[in-house]
Amino acid sequence: MRLILLSGLLLLGIFLANGHEQDPDGKVLNSLIDALMDLQREFAKLRGAFLTVYKARSFGNGSERMYVTNKEIKNFEALRQICEQAEGHIPSPQLENQNKAFANVLERHGKEAYLVVGDSANFTNWAAGEPNKAAGACVKADTHGSWHSTSCDDNLLVVCEFYFIL
């Protein structure tokens, strides 16, 4: 959308730089201005629609982070690539409500998924006896949101985390 707006501004700038001898009544200029204003209105509508969906999703799951699956089953490295390509992140719940939102996705699909636990995490939800480095260097969440050590080679549900700075 920004590209379209910039293109319109560029055309307007070129028109203004070339003078008005080909458009003495200003019809072309007015047409360009009208088109640019239409694009701005459309952009505002799209932004509003996006924010409405974002607010509804975050209200519905109690978290401002969204956890989304493509229903694929992959290992940790494939998950990392998929989330990066989608401009998301490997889930890293920092609060109980975020972990609950993440667990809701897992429960709905009846699958486990990887997550990342930071060294300075204030919130953790390790299952009894965990973390267990002998089980593996990665972490997975079960359908209840409890965290377990696991191998990074396990094939688990692909879930990516998305959050927005507004």
UniProtKB/Swiss-Prot annotation:
Pfam family, one: Lectin_C
Transmembrane segments annotated in the record for this chain: none
Location within or outside the cell: Secreted
InterPro entries: C-type_lectin-like, C-type_lectin-like/link_sf, C-type_lectin_CS, CTDL_fold
Disulfide bonds: C83-C160, C138-C152
Family according to the record: Belongs to the alpha-type phospholipase A2 inhibitor family.
Protein name: Phospholipase A2 inhibitor clone 06/08
Secretion signal, residue range per the UniProt entry: 1-19
Coiled-coil spans in chain: none
Record note on quaternary structure: Homotrimer; non-covalently linked.
Broad class of where this protein is predominantly found: secreted
Domain of life of the native organism: Eukaryota
GO cellular component, as recorded: extracellular region
Residues bearing carbohydrate: N61, N122
Gene3D superfamilies per UniProt: Mannose-Binding Protein A, subunit A
Domain called C-type lectin: residue spans: 46-161
Tissue specificity field: Expressed by the liver.
GO molecular function, one term: phospholipase A2 inhibitor activity
Stated role: This phospholipase A2 inhibitor binds directly phospholipase A2 in the presence or absence of calcium.
Organism: Bothrops neuwiedi
Lineage start: Eukaryota, Metazoa, Chordata, Craniata, Vertebrata
Sorted UniProt keywords: Calcium, Disulfide bond, Glycoprotein, Lectin, Phospholipase A2 inhibitor, Secreted, Signal
